[in-house]
Design a protein with these regions (language model features):
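All-alpha prenyltransferase/terpene-synthase fold signal
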Residues: 1-130
């Protein structure tokens, strides 16, 4: 595939994964979004998908609470639990991996301002908070 096509696909995935993290980690002031809207809507996000792989009782209970009809009343507790859970570190690492793969794709382009701008854009996508 062409470097720019690969870049676009990979940075698009990274953008969505960052959005999954923002839904859990950020405040309305930071992102403009109410935290947990994807969770309440039952949207399958990367942290929840990764959480399903954990075998400990606490993780299983958290996953069950999220996937069996999460309520607005339970949301603050669930968000706090997710924010402290190792699954968030795993999800962040996966997001960084996609960003790194996007950067790797544009390394096939000639050195110069275009490549530098794409690398800067990829880094900004992965580092965004809102």
């Amino acid at each position: 595939q062409e470097p720019l096509q690969l870049f676009g696909e990979r940075i698009g995935v990274a953008f969505q994964l960052v959005d999954d993290l923002i839904d859990i980690e950020s405040t309305k002031e930071e992102s403009g979004k109410v935290a947990g809207t994807d969770l309440l809507a039952g949207v399958p996000t990367l942290p929840v998908l990764l959480l399903s792989k954990f075998e400990d009782a606490e993780s299983k209970a958290l996953y069950q609470k999220i996937t069996s009809g999460l309520t607005l009343e339970d949301l603050p507790t669930v968000l706090a639990s997710l924010r402290e859970h190792p699954v968030m570190e795993q999800a962040r690492a996966e997001t960084v991996r996609w960003g790194d793969q996007a950067i790797e794709a544009v390394m096939a382009l000639p050195a110069g301002s275009v490549r530098e701008a794409l690398v800067a854009f990829a880094n900004a996508v992965v580092d965004r908070k809102g």
